[in-house]
């Protein structure tokens, strides 16, 4: 394998995981804050808010998992290496 391609793959894998975690991390923090605020305003809606929050957490976390899959593909099944 070309050393430049190997180095670029490692850097790209690191960036893929790092950048894929930034957005969902910020989104989860914002969503949790608004969920706590909503539960404080309407305690009787706690179950619905919590269910919607957990579902949205799953969708947000899937973006991070996709970044991890791309990083693993770049490291171990690199399509750019000959």
Swiss-Prot record:
InterPro entries given in the database record: ATP_synth_csu_bac/chlpt, ATP_synth_F0_csu, ATP_synth_F0_csu_DDCD_BS, ATP_synth_F0_csu_sf, ATPase_proteolipid_c-like_dom, F/V-ATP_Csub_sf
Example GO molecular function: lipid binding
Gene Ontology CC annotations of this record: chloroplast thylakoid membrane; proton-transporting ATP synthase complex; proton-transporting two-sector ATPase complex, proton-transporting domain
Keywords: ATP synthesis, CF(0), Chloroplast, Hydrogen ion transport, Ion transport, Lipid-binding, Membrane, Plastid, Thylakoid, Transmembrane, Transmembrane helix, Transport
Lyase as UniProt keyword: no
Record SUPFAM superfamilies: F1F0 ATP synthase subunit C
Origin: domain of life: Eukaryota
Membrane topology: Multi-pass membrane protein
Cellular compartments annotated: Plastid, Chloroplast thylakoid membrane
Transmembrane segments: 3-23, 57-77
Biological function: F(1)F(0) ATP synthase produces ATP from ADP in the presence of a proton or sodium gradient. F-type ATPases consist of two structural domains, F(1) containing the extramembraneous catalytic core and F(0) containing the membrane proton channel, linked together by a central stalk and a peripheral stalk. During catalysis, ATP synthesis in the catalytic domain of F(1) is coupled via a rotary mechanism of the central stalk subunits to proton translocation. Key component of the F(0) channel; it plays a direct role in translocation across the membrane. A homomeric c-ring of between 10-14 subunits forms the central stalk rotor element with the F(1) delta and epsilon subunits.
NCBIfam families: ATP_synt_c, PRK07354.1
Quaternary state and interactors: F-type ATPases have 2 components, F(1) - the catalytic core - and F(0) - the membrane proton channel. F(1) has five subunits: alpha(3), beta(3), gamma(1), delta(1), epsilon(1). F(0) has four main subunits: a(1), b(1), b'(1) and c(10-14). The alpha and beta chains form an alternating ring which encloses part of the gamma chain. F(1) is attached to F(0) by a central stalk formed by the gamma and epsilon chains, while a peripheral stalk is formed by the delta, b and b' chains.
HAMAP family attached to this UniProt entry: ATP_synth_c_bact
Extra facts: In plastids the F-type ATPase is also known as CF(1)CF(0).
Identification of the protein by name: ATP synthase subunit c, chloroplastic
Name of the encoding gene: atpH
């Amino acid at each position: 394998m070309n050393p430049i391609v190997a180095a670029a793959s490692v850097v790209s894998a690191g960036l893929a995981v790092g950048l894929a975690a930034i957005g969902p991390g910020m989104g989860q923090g914002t969503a949790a804050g608004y969920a706590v605020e909503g539960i404080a305003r309407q305690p009787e809606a706690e179950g619905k808010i919590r269910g919607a929050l957990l579902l949205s957490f799953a969708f947000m976390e899937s973006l991070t998992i996709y970044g991890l899959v791309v990083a693993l593909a770049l490291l171990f099944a690199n399509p750019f290496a000959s």
